[in-house]
Every structure is written in C-alpha cells, then in structure tokens.
Amino acid sequence: MATPVDPPNGIRNQGKHYFSMWQTLFEIDTKYVPIKPIGRGAYGVVCSSVNRESNERVAIKKIHNVFENRIDALRTLRELKLLRHLRHENVVALKDVMMANHKRSFKDVYLVYELMDTDLHQIIKSSQVLSNDHCQYFLFQLLRGLKYIHSANILHRDLKPGNLLVNANCDLKICDFGLARTSNTKGQFMTEYVVTRWYRAPELLLCCDNYGTSIDVWSVGCIFAELLGRKPVFPGTECLNQIKLIINILGSQREEDLEFIDNPKAKRYIESLPYSPGISFSRLYPGANVLAIDLLQKMLVLDPSKRISVTEALQHPYMAPLYDPSANPPAQVPIDLDVDEDEDLGAEMIRELMWKEMIHYHPEAATINNNEVSEF
C-alpha cells in the first residue's frame, strides 16, 4: 500500500504530497490519491491512484532519474510526444504528465495513464480459459488500434503481449511507444533497436535496411499464435537461433521469397540452413478455428512484401463479424511529428522538450514559471 512520508530534506513543494511504495518515493500532485503499487520495470514503479477531482482511477508511472541514460530519456520523450496526439480506444490514453518544480534540475518524470487491470502476457500465462471468441476479440482490437497507429505514419516496433493492456471486460489497449518511429523514415533507426526478439520480424533479424508497417504485422502474428497455443511460437535464445526456429516452422523458402534480404551475409546464412518441410499451423494449434489458422498463415510470411496488411487482416473472414470500416477513421496527427529526429538531441534539449510536453498538460505553469520557461 501507499505510505505517506515526509518530503526529502523536509521541504514540501507546493501542490505536491509524498508517499513511499516498494521503497520508492512518489512526489505527486495532491489531486492524486495513490492506492498501491501495481508494477515495476527497468524504468521504475507504477501505482494505481484516484484523481480526486474527477474520481477517475489512473495508473501513475514514475520514471526515476530519467536523464541518467540518454536512450531511456529519448524513449520517454518519444512516448510523451506520440501519446499526446494519438487518441483511440485501442491505444492507452496518457491523461497527464505531472509538472516538475524546476526546469533545470528535475530528475524524475510522472506519467498518468488510464488504469487497466492486467496485460495479455499475464492472461496468456494464467489458467484462464481462452475461447475462440476471446482470441478473435483480442486480435480484432489489436489490429484496429494498429490500423489507427499506422494511419498516423507510425510504426510501433515493440508489439508483444506485455505491451497490450487488458481490463476485466476484455478491452485491449496498445501501450509503450518508446521504440516507435515514423514509417516514412527508412533504414536509419537501428541504433537502439532492442525489441523483444521473439516478436521481431525476419527483415529486422536479417538486418535489412528498409522496413515498414509489415514489421508490426509479424509481431501481431506471433502474439496471435501465442494466444492460440499459450506459449511463444518462436522462443529463440539468440538472433541466429530465432531465424532457425522461424524457418523450422515456415519451412525452407524459395529463391524468390528471399529477394527481400539485402544483406548478403544474412542471405547466405538462410540458404545454409538444413532443408525444413515446415510445420503446419493447423498441426501446431489443432483446436483453433480454421479461419484463424488461415489468417495466421497470412501474417507469418517471411517475405514482408507478401505478408498481409493490417487493413487486409481486418477484412479477412475471421474478422468479418467484428470489423466495420466506417467505424475506423484515420488518425488526425501532424505529419511533421519529429520523433525520428530526436536521436541527435543533447541532454539539455531533451530536458527542454520534456518540459514543453509537461506544459501542454499544465498551460498555467507557463506563466507561473515564466522565469524558467523559454519561448517555443
């Protein structure tokens, strides 16, 4: 539970109160009443809370020492920029970014999201029975959210069960946009690509220069297979083993299906693998719906140019009972959203831009802290 504590050094900042959860200090706006910690990651701790002004339940993520690691700081900035613009019922909503007290010295960032009950990873590994209706509805919502994200020219690049939040009535929302990129920037953002290997598309494993929205479709296929089988379909131990597992199930590929590989060394490796006849998905998932298997086969295709698109997947007969094209308008997002250019930023500019994001949620602070806020 959340334990009230005195502020550090006995100095209480205006509009803040202080709590300890899992040995972590939370300095949060007084309108939020923390309940209990609900998650922990490399970034810090997440707690559930209530906004006493709106009576809404929210999740507060504290990112500790955000500037300690430049890559983590960039991920946080990217999340802030994107979620301020993305508005869709299958994308987690960022409700607030708490205003830091001092622009030049703040170290921690507090993000306030809508509260969800669990994530798809927890559901898959639980004993909860997953019917065809469950699998169909989860997949539909994932594809629907992804269609919206792609319509904003954004690649998520880190789709996995743990990044899909779920609540008790099976509503699903995509979260964690720290690795997202715009899809009109090609072949220049591999530097910190650390997406979970098991869900990584072949074109990324094979170090191809050009890739697009189909990388997210591959990840969706891996997640769908995991829903059907209750375990990862390609649980590789390292990169080469990951490729080997993929070929083992998909089968050895024809020459024309390897033309997308523009890395000669990677192509030679694929061609050197022993012949595999492949394993049919209907054999791997004998209890699955026939249409589900057909859609899965179209998602998990090695050549990205032959992989089904998100829109085509939503129009597939397996999704037909749920999909209404008129209910899926494209995202209204600025086309110059510059999340890719951030990689060259220095620490002070990252700090400046984070402060700017806070100001979007607290415009009154721009005048109150007039002496600290530069013109944007």
From Swiss-Prot:
A motif (TXY) lies at residues 191-193. GO terms for molecular function: ATP binding; MAP kinase activity; protein kinase activity; protein serine kinase activity. The active site is at 158 (proton acceptor). It is an enzyme of class 2 (transferase). Keywords: ATP-binding, Kinase, Nucleotide-binding, Phosphoprotein, Serine/threonine-protein kinase, Transferase. Activated by threonine and tyrosine phosphorylation. It holds the Pfam family Pkinase. Highest levels in the stem. Present in the leaf, root and flower, but not in seeds. SUPFAM superfamilies: Protein kinase-like (PK-like). ATP binds at residues 38-46, 61. Belongs to the protein kinase superfamily. CMGC Ser/Thr protein kinase family. MAP kinase subfamily. The TXY motif contains the threonine and tyrosine residues whose phosphorylation activates the MAP kinases. Dually phosphorylated on Thr-191 and Tyr-193, which activates the enzyme. Phosphorylated on Ser residue. It catalyses: L-seryl-[protein] + ATP = O-phospho-L-seryl-[protein] + ADP + H(+); L-threonyl-[protein] + ATP = O-phospho-L-threonyl-[protein] + ADP + H(+). The modification Phosphothreonine is found at residues 191, 196. InterPro entries: Kinase-like_dom_sf (IPR011009), MAP_kinase (IPR050117), MAP_kinase_CS (IPR003527), Prot_kinase_dom (IPR000719), Protein_kinase_ATP_BS (IPR017441), Ser/Thr_kinase_AS (IPR008271). This is Mitogen-activated protein kinase 2. Residues 32-319 form the Protein kinase domain.
